[in-house]
Amino acid sequence: MTINLPEKEAKRVQIAVDRNPVETSFQKWAKPGHFSRTLAKGPNTTTWIWNLHADAHDFDSHTSDLQDISRKVFSAHFGQLGIILIWLSGMYFHGARFSNYEAWLSDPTHIKPSAQIVWPIVGQEILNGDVGGGFQGVQITSGFFQLWRASGITSELQLYTTAVVGLVLAGAMFFAGWFHYHKAAPKLEWFQNVESMLNHHLGGLLGLGSLGWAGHQIHVSLPVNKLLDAGVDPKEIPLPHEFFLNKQLMIDLYPSFAKGLTPFFTLQWSEYSDFLTFKGGLNEVTGGLNLSDTAHHHLAIAVLFLIAGHMYRTNWGIGHSIKEILDAHKGPLTGEGHKGLYEILTTSWHAQLAINLALFGSLSIVVAHHMYSMPPYPYLATDYATQLSLFTHHCWIGGFCIVGAGAHAAIFMVRDYDPTNNYNNLLDRVLRHRDAIISHLNWVSIFLGFHSFGLYIHNDTMSALGRPQDMFSDTAIQLQPVFAQWVQNTHFMAPQLTAPNALAATSATWGGDVVAVGGKVAMMPISLGTADFMVHHIHAFTIHVTVLILLKGVLFARSSRLIPDKANLGFRFPCDGPGRGGTCQVSAWDHVFLGLFWMYNSLSIVIFHFSWKMQSDVFGTVVNNTVSHITAGNFAQSANTINGWLRDFLWSQSSQVIQSYGSALSAYGLIFLGAHFILLTGMLDIFSGRGYWQELIESILWSHAKLKVAPTIQPRALSITQGRAVGVAHYLLGGIATTWSFFLARIIAVG
């Protein structure tokens, strides 16, 4: 006889909802500040509009009821999905209505992608450059054309249809957001049922999602792309449904289709090796990954996640319990281990969001590095402007997510952390030796900063004194990145031992031959030298400083030596009251503020490194088996001095954007100029003290009051925190737009 212990029994999953919990009221919705008793009274001073923006989405400040907060977040997620679908639909609609997609599809090596035609109002039609094939438009660098070809889209009608479906789905999302807040709102226990959530997200979203995509790739993408690669006119290619209905079409392309589903159900999947391949390397025709490899990959992912979707204990007494796993997770040196973390993650959405943002942001930066080294879509590798744009985009998205992780971890510490429930567990132990963690990070940052910058200073000095033989370079004193070179070589050699059936290594960057498409380099081995070694340590320095700032903000969010009661002051506060020196700009929010600057610094150096390295050592043309790179390999010679970066990268490569006036690239010249002004606005907000503005406003206000023309809503200078927020927003917007215009004008002109 077996007795089930109460904690071993699975909590039965029931979809518990409250019916009609909140009435739909447009009157309430239309009233600014309806979520706050203070704000709903309306404005007395101009501070009101700032507080309105600051608190509109801060659901914690509207109510302390976790169930209501959870419902608001859940509902907002549907709204977010709706907005994303509208945006995506717009992209597909532009492809259908304003693009040269069909022309590009017929000749992707000579025709550039364009999906925007500027209307002639006062001469803007100059922006419609000649992209080839007799089409005038703005060249786009989003990678959508390459994605569409990989999906098997062969006509603009298919893009139209997808755009319409996107709008229908967006409508469904907006409806769901309203329905699940106003009509059938889930109860708190539904949000806290992590096992059921994991099963559905892993098995449903990732498992079935990957399976569906693998199915689409096998039945639509593969046959369409095989015919396109063979040079068949897109208009002659059968429509997607014909490959379903007419089995012979598939058998002609992939003979194993003749065997039907027998090998599938008997698990003889190797019989399908003509379309589920393991080739490695890149497709010689398109320069992208072999789509039969990616179909195989998505099928494998689907199998793994469908299994993972059955791993967690719900209505049946089998599977993992997350609470049991966490509570049992102890090491010999970690006290109570993970005890108490389950309670944190089921009652603090900030804590959960922090972890998810950190992981998602890191993943985005990993994606950035794979998009060029293993370009997943046809003809992506030879579209240099798109390559540069995608790398930059995924780095910045990742950076913002990682800083967001620091922000929400700090908000969790201030608002949700309960010291009484966390005694001697991992979190408590980290907090108790935070001084050691921060001082070590501080030391590492100083060490990396002085030593890596010192190498550059040495080189600049030797260069200025005319002593090239005493510089750190590949031709004088070498600092070769031997570990990185070993990793490259290992990855190049490994497949011959570990995957003998693979035709090539995972990426052409490891070693081997140049992959060229249409006379352009798609990818080739990337050699690393002294200049890479030096800039790598600058990356290490800036990333460690970013981590130092964010982690210090989190670990000292509740208290510090100077302000032991910091938790009572909240997430953001300008100073700790009058009469206490040194307590200004030390809130957790201020650490996020500083973290944003360092994130931007870190990633600027990353994308500059990438842009110059690729132009110097990868991007270029191939004539008679000879590769000519855009900047002829000057990275190794110049990137080892500060002067080299300023002269041969920033100054030399900005000539295209500065001289773009009067050409199709002139918009980038204007953006470059305008974004510098936004950058300066950011600086002004950050550097100027609040007192100066308040004095100025007070004197103007006094004269208005004297003349009895004073406004009813009194002007106020921005608070210190608001000034910093406006400053960092302008700094980032200005910096990103400056870099964007600089990169694109350059690479579109020379690439």
UniProtKB/Swiss-Prot annotation:
Chlorophyll a binds at M683, Y692. P700 is a chlorophyll a/chlorophyll a' dimer, A0 is one or more chlorophyll a, A1 is one or both phylloquinones and FX is a shared 4Fe-4S iron-sulfur center. GO terms for biological process: photosynthesis. Keywords: 4Fe-4S, Chlorophyll, Chloroplast, Chromophore, Electron transport, Iron, Iron-sulfur, Magnesium, Membrane, Metal-binding, Oxidoreductase, Photosynthesis, Photosystem I, Plastid, Thylakoid, Transmembrane, Transmembrane helix, Transport. Its EC number is 1.97.1.12. It is an enzyme of class 1 (oxidoreductase). Chlorophyll a' binds at H676. It comes from the Eukaryota. PANTHER family: OUTER MEMBRANE PROTEIN, OMPA-RELATED, PHOTOSYSTEM I P700 CHLOROPHYLL A APOPROTEIN A1-RELATED. PsaA and PsaB bind P700, the primary electron donor of photosystem I (PSI), as well as the electron acceptors A0, A1 and FX. PSI is a plastocyanin/cytochrome c6-ferredoxin oxidoreductase, converting photonic excitation into a charge separation, which transfers an electron from the donor P700 chlorophyll pair to the spectroscopically characterized acceptors A0, A1, FX, FA and FB in turn. Oxidized P700 is reduced on the lumenal side of the thylakoid membrane by plastocyanin or cytochrome c6. The PsaA/B heterodimer binds the P700 chlorophyll special pair and subsequent electron acceptors. PSI consists of a core antenna complex that captures photons, and an electron transfer chain that converts photonic excitation into a charge separation. The eukaryotic PSI reaction center is composed of at least 11 subunits. This is Photosystem I P700 chlorophyll a apoprotein A1. It comes from Stigeoclonium helveticum.
